[in-house]
Amino acid sequence: MVDSSPPERPDLYVVARMLERLWRENGPMLKTRLQTACNVNYDVFRKYLAWMLSKGLVSVQNCEDGHERVSLTPKGEESYRKLVQWISEVIQGRMPGQ
């Protein structure tokens, strides 16, 4: 599974890209496919995946075909919604409902 040490201070844009890609997929996603979709190298991906696992945002399933798939947990889905709302309000200056 994941044996990489998580980042001490994660880049929220990387976290947001990973959460968003998993949210849009609407189901488990192959690790390598998620890594390329997030446009980060594999070492960076492993660190962020370890961090997200430690926070309960994602889960990793070993599948019968020998591949590992990543999916959002309910906590990950809620975190994605909150992050999108925060970006809209703070970064883009939009209030909810606008």
Per-range role (PLM):
Residues 1-19:
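Short alpha-helical segments that sit at the start of domains
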Residues 9, 39-54:
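Short amphipathic alpha-helical interaction segments
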Residues 22-26:
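Short helix-capping/hinge SLiMs at alpha-helix to coil transitions
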Residues 27-37:
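Short acidic, hydrophobic short linear motifs in intrinsically disordered regions
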Residues 66-80:
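Basic, amphipathic "hinge/linker" alpha-helix immediately C-terminal to the N-terminal HTH DNA-binding motif
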